From Swiss-Prot:
Protein name: Biotin synthase
PROSITE patterns attached to this UniProt entry: RADICAL_SAM (PS51918)
Annotated cofactor note: Binds 1 [4Fe-4S] cluster. The cluster is coordinated with 3 cysteines and an exchangeable S-adenosyl-L-methionine. Binds 1 [2Fe-2S] cluster. The cluster is coordinated with 3 cysteines and 1 arginine.
Summary of the function given for this chain in its UniProt record: Catalyzes the conversion of dethiobiotin (DTB) to biotin by the insertion of a sulfur atom into dethiobiotin via a radical-based mechanism.
Binding site for [2Fe-2S] cluster: C97, C128, C188, R260
Origin species: Escherichia coli (strain K12)
Listed pathway(s): Cofactor biosynthesis; biotin biosynthesis; biotin from 7,8-diaminononanoate: step 2/2
Radical SAM core domain sequence ranges: 38-256
Length: 346
């Protein structure tokens, strides 16, 4: 395998300082070398266990330390989760992500988590989970169940991290990513723009991700969703061009990774989202609820896809599953119906 050069902070900073149009041009060139620019990977995210998290992440309404009005819920029943996955697939998603508000999963919950993964995989969907810190044995059990992706974000640079989270160290996050990788699961890891970080911190986050032994296959870039009751509720809004720059730099630094527009899309107008796609974003979360915060409704996403000439990307599915292509095409051509997946109703 050819040696992959490591990025330096000065190199990343230079990218952030480029004139915006030059940066977008470079990012689009890199993107076209590795991906079909008209294809966007579509995922659906479901909160399978909501609230009462012991962590103190200052941006998160699921923390038990903040009064956000969010009601805590127990781990969902397996069949409830699988029914949501069926609706997600019917609406055109190809990856189903399951998130639980835990510091780490309990051993007693592992059999249910394994059943969820197996059930989602049996539908021909890719399966993704985000459950907090994993042990080696837990990562291996999820891998054996067929889990495709595990999400565990670094959130920000190592230098700024302590201003946002104190209940989990940066090294713990890196260790979990290593255990996931060693178990044979693909890594999904990114961060948040708008925490109060500097451009140098954004560069530091992307530096950490790109310089992992193997960069994440999926890199979600979130725009802070300010939730009343959290310590960051009064943070300044993120400048759209700053966010677009972050997407573009991520694309250049991790040319073969999927760069996902995640939380915060509800706050973006169509023009900002279009520029993010131009900057190299090629994955979105689809549907109107992203764990506990709003996300654009499917029909708005499909309308934007039509305007921009974008298509949902297909993924490898199980043999005998011939409905996927038809459903993806139908999702693009059919106006909004009651059958569209609506996570907010769960």
């Amino acid at each position: 395998m050819a040696h992959r050069p490591r990025w330096t902070l000065s190199q990343v900073t230079e990218l952030f300082e480029k004139p915006l149009l030059d940066l977008l041009f470079e990012a689009q060139q890199v993107h076209r070398q590795h991906f079909d620019p008209r294809q966007v990977q579509v995922s659906t995210l479901l909160s399978i266990k909501t609230g009462a998290c012991p962590e103190d992440c200052k941006y998160c309404p699921q923390s038990s330390r903040y009064k956000t009005g969010l009601e805590a819920e127990r781990l969902m029943e397996v069949e409830q989760v699988l029914e949501s996955a069926r609706k997600a697939k019917a609406a055109g998603s190809t990856r189903f992500c399951m998130g639980a508000a835990w510091k780490n999963p309990h051993e007693r919950d592992m059999p249910y988590l394994e059943q969820m993964v197996q059930g989602v995989k049996a539908m021909g969907l890719e399966a993704c989970m985000t459950l907090g810190t994993l042990s080696e044995s837990q990562a291996q059990r999820l891998a054996n169940a067929g889990l495709d992706y595990y999400n565990h974000n670094l959130d920000t640079s190592p230098e700024f991290y302590g201003n946002i989270i104190t209940t989990r160290t940066y090294q713990e996050r890196l260790d979990t990513l290593e255990k996931v990788r060693d178990a044979g699961i693909k890594v999904c890891s990114g961060g948040i723009v708008g925490l109060g970080e500097t451009v140098k911190d954004r560069a530091g986050l992307l530096l950490q991700l790109a310089n992992l032994p193997t960069p994440p296959e999926s890199v979600p870039i979130n725009m802070l969703v300010k939730v009343k009751g959290t310590p960051l509720a009064d943070n300044d809004d993120v400048d759209a061009f700053d966010f677009i720059r972050t997407i573009a730099v991520a694309r250049i630094m991790m040319p073969t990774s999927y760069v996902r527009l995640s939380a915060g899309r509800e706050q973006m107008n169509e023009q900002t989202q279009a520029m993010c796609f131009m900057a190299g974003a090629n994955s979105i979360f689809y549907g109107c609820k992203l764990l506990t915060t709003p996300n654009p409704e499917e029909d708005k996403d499909l309308q934007l896809f039509r305007k921009l000439g974008l298509n949902p990307q297909q993924t490898a599915v199980l043999a005998g599953d011939n409905e996927q292509q038809q459903r993806l095409e139908q999702a693009l051509m059919t106006p909004d119906t009651d059958e569209y997946y609506n996570a907010a109703a769960l």
